[in-house]
Regions:
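Membrane-embedded alpha-helical segments that form the functional core of polytopic membrane enzymes
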Residues: 1-31, 39, 63-67, 76, ...
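Transmembrane alpha-helical segments that form the membrane-embedded catalytic/substrate-channel core
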Residues: 16-24, 87-95, 136-154, 187, ...
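Short alpha-helical packing/oligomerization segments
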Residues: 188-213
Length: 253
């Protein structure tokens, strides 16, 4: 039993270090853009509380440590997934934010890989449906979550030159439609998980009710440009993930 807890600890350490390293590189590449946005202007680099060289060293150190730690203490598959997370986030998603609005879809890929790191770290087959179910759960969850953020901060994103689907969507109509579409994808995914025997049917029923409840601000939205409904929908996405993961942990115990 103790060995399992140590394995969990090493997996968490390696995954966290890889994520922090990716975030450091992201902020290095976006110093000037972050300085233009109120929500990011107080980060260490744009606020000049940290030097570029120090951030570069921290980024490389954390990213390298995370991948190497996973390879040494967990397994090669976990290290490969961590390296893929860093590569996609830093070299594809980050620059893509400047030239194509589909960057949110691409950015959701590295954001959804960590559950796969945990899956293979625990000894699961990297091709197993259970691991990929968790990947798609995180993937589809991120989209409504970040659509709401990007709409609420759309003026800042436009000022910084980021190409987001919310750009120019003053009424919020397009963002609302996208929010609903990918929320339906979430519901469909969990129904598929139940239908294939990953967990009992009550999980799918409870999940569907939860998603519909949390979508209420968007479903009643009149595309009037009001911020309150979108903010409520965003807060709902924050509530959604821990509730669902706790429910899945209970169903799988």
């Amino acid at each position: 039993m103790a060995d399992k807890w140590w394995l969990l600890l090493h997996t968490l350490i390696g995954t966290a270090a890889s994520a922090f390293g990716s975030a450091a590189f992201n902020q290095l590449m976006e110093i000037e853009d972050d300085a233009r946005m109120q929500r990011t202007s107080d980060r260490p680099l744009p606020s000049r509380r940290m030097s570029v060289m120090k951030a570069f060293g921290i980024g490389w150190g954390l990213a390298a440590f995370g991948v190497i730690h996973l390879a040494a203490k967990v397994n090669a598959e976990a290290a490969i997934f961590a390296a893929a997370t860093i590569a996609i986030y830093v070299f594809v998603y980050t620059p893509m934010k400047k030239w194509h609005s589909s960057n949110t879809l691409v950015g959701a890929i590295p954001g959804a890989i960590p559950p796969l790191i945990g899956w293979v770290g625990a000894g699961g087959d990297w091709m197993a449906w259970g691991g990929w179910f968790l990947f798609w759960l995180l993937f589809f969850w991120q989209l409504p979550h970040f659509f709401a953020i990007s709409w609420l901060c759309r003026e800042e994103y436009e000022e910084a030159g980021y190409q987001m689907w919310s750009n120019g969507d003053v009424t919020g109509r397009k963002t609302s439609v996208l929010f609903v579409v990918f929320s339906i994808c979430l519901m469909s995914l969990v129904i598929a998980g139940s239908a294939t025997g990953l967990f009992p049917s009550w999980v799918a029923v409870a999940h569907t009710a939860l998603v519909i409840y949390l979508m209420r601000p968007i479903l009643s939205y009149r595309a009037s440009g009001e911020r309150a409904p979108m903010r409520k929908a965003f807060l709902g996405t924050l509530l959604y993930l821990p509730l669902v993961l706790v429910g899945l942990a209970f169903a799988w115990t």
